[in-house]
């Protein structure tokens, strides 16, 4: 691990092989937390590239519980709708609310989420408040998709390997250090939907997230970042100001555009 840390301290990007080694070391319960912390801090200081982030996610998904949605004969396209959080506006959970609307249009919504960390209402919190069981095993999740066209994957139940980084993540969070784990939550859906919309808290991250989703095999992906009427950032499509939308996918090159409510006949 020391060699990887020194590599990152020289501001050198990791090769795909080095990303795999680094990701496996992070998930190794026997690896010391101080080394994991040094690796994560060095990676953060260098700045994670889209290729590196996609590589880490691919390794982490290999350790995730597979819900085996390929066993199903689903009629509609599969999609996840989520956000990074972190905009600090204390909004209600828009993506979790929208999952039911999206499912009603005929798409099959494979929602992957957790309890709130940067907000008061994570996806799991909202569904639990509605009396919905959030920790269904894979068979129950598939049953929901077949019967209702919508299902929820509770992140802790599908990523048991992340127990190996709980301590170091808490340690770095207390120091105010942002790591790759603050970025990848929306990318870790073990059902691997065909389509995905991700709201991001930083406007400049939109192209990177679109590229990452493309690298992860999404047929169609949108990364969006909105602004309020007074210019504050929101990790949603905004009804109050402009929204940057970066579109990408297996069958399309990156498209970067700006939309406003008036483009759709709405006044704000």
Spans of features found by a protein language model:
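Short beta-strand segments at enzyme active-site cores
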Residues: 35-36, 109-112, 223
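Aromatic/hydrophobic pocket-lining residues that form π-stacking "cages" and hydrophobic walls in ligand
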Residues: 39, 98, 209
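Glycine-rich anion-binding loops and their surrounding alpha/beta cores
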Residues: 7, 62-65, 69-72, 91, ...
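Acidic, glycine/proline-rich low-complexity segments that act as flexible tails and inter-domain linkers
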Residues: 1-90, 105
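Conserved short-loop catalytic and cofactor-binding motifs
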Residues: 44, 114-115, 193-197
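Short, mixed-charge, low-aromatic patches
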Residues: 10-17, 51-57, 81-83, 97-102, ...
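A generic, well-ordered mixed alpha/beta core segment in the N-terminal half of proteins
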Residues: 80-83, 87-145
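Generic structural signal for well-ordered, non-membrane alpha-helical segments
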Residues: 1, 12-19, 32, 36, ...
